[in-house]
Amino acid sequence: MGGSLRVAVLGAPGVGKTAIIRQFLFGDYPERHRPTDGPRLYRPAVLLDGAVYDLSIRDGDVAGPGSSPGGPEEWPDAKDWSLQDTDAFVLVYDICSPDSFDYVKALRQRIAETRPAGAPEAPILVVGNKRDRQRLRFGPRRALAALVRRGWRCGYLECSAKYNWHVLRLFRELLRCALVRARPAHPALRLQGALHPARCSLM
C-alpha cells in the first residue's frame, strides 16, 4: 500500500472542475452544466508506479452560494475548505474566461497565506480547461504557461474535460509531484514534464 493523498480541485464556478473529476474517475462528461451543490468528496484508489494510493479528491467552489468570484474577501475561512491539510491542489480556469484566471491567481495567493508555518509546501497545478474551445481563448498558451511556471512557480497544463484530453496526465503529474514533496530524501523533480514515464490507473 502506498498511503493516502488529499487533493483539492478548486476554481471559479463553471470552469469544469466536476467534469474533470468525472472524466478521471468514471470516463463520462455531463453535456449540460449543473452547478455543484456544496463540496463533494471522492475517494478512489489509484495505482501509481506499482503502488496503490487512497485519494481524497475534494470538489467544490470556494466562494459561498450566491457569491461572485470577485476576490478572496468573499470566501469562507480557509479551515472550512481544507486548505491547511491538503497535500496537492488543482486550480482550474476556463481558457476563454480571463475572470476565471484572475480567480485562480487570487486563490493561489490565498493558499500561500493560509498554509501553517513550517508546513511542507503543497504542489499546485494550474489547469486551463476547455482546450476544445481553443479559438475563443483570451490569451496565448505560451505566455500564460510562462507566467504560471516562472512567476507563480506552479505547474501548468491545459486539458479538455469534454474530450478527455490530458485529464489523466494532469492527475498523474500532480500525484507524483506530491509524493516527491512528501519524501524530501528523493531528488527534487520539477512538476511540469517530470511524469511522462509514470503509470497511473484507477483500481
Swiss-Prot record:
Bilayer topology: Lipid-anchor
Reaction(s) catalysed by this chain's protein: GTP + H2O = GDP + phosphate + H(+)
Primary site of residence: membrane
PTM per Swiss-Prot/TrEMBL: Isoprenylation is essential for nucleolar localization, and the proliferation-inhibiting activity of RASL10A.
GO biological process: small GTPase-mediated signal transduction
Compartment(s) of residence: Cell membrane; Nucleus, Nucleolus
EC number: 3.6.5.2
Residues annotated as binding GTP: 11-18, 59-62, 129-132
Transmembrane segments: none
SUPFAM superfamilies named in the record: P-loop containing nucleoside triphosphate hydrolases (SSF52540)
Lipidation (S-farnesyl cysteine): C200
Modified residues (Cysteine methyl ester): C200
A GO MF label: G protein activity
Proregion span(s): 201-203
Assigned keywords, A-Z: Cell membrane, GTP-binding, Hydrolase, Lipoprotein, Membrane, Methylation, Nucleotide-binding, Nucleus, Prenylation, Tumor suppressor
One GO cellular component term: nucleolus
Domain of life: Eukaryota
Known function: Potent inhibitor of cellular proliferation.
Family to which the UniProt record says this protein belongs: Belongs to the small GTPase superfamily. Ras family.
Protein's recorded name: Ras-like protein family member 10A
Lineage per the UniProt record: Eukaryota, Metazoa, Chordata, Craniata, Vertebrata
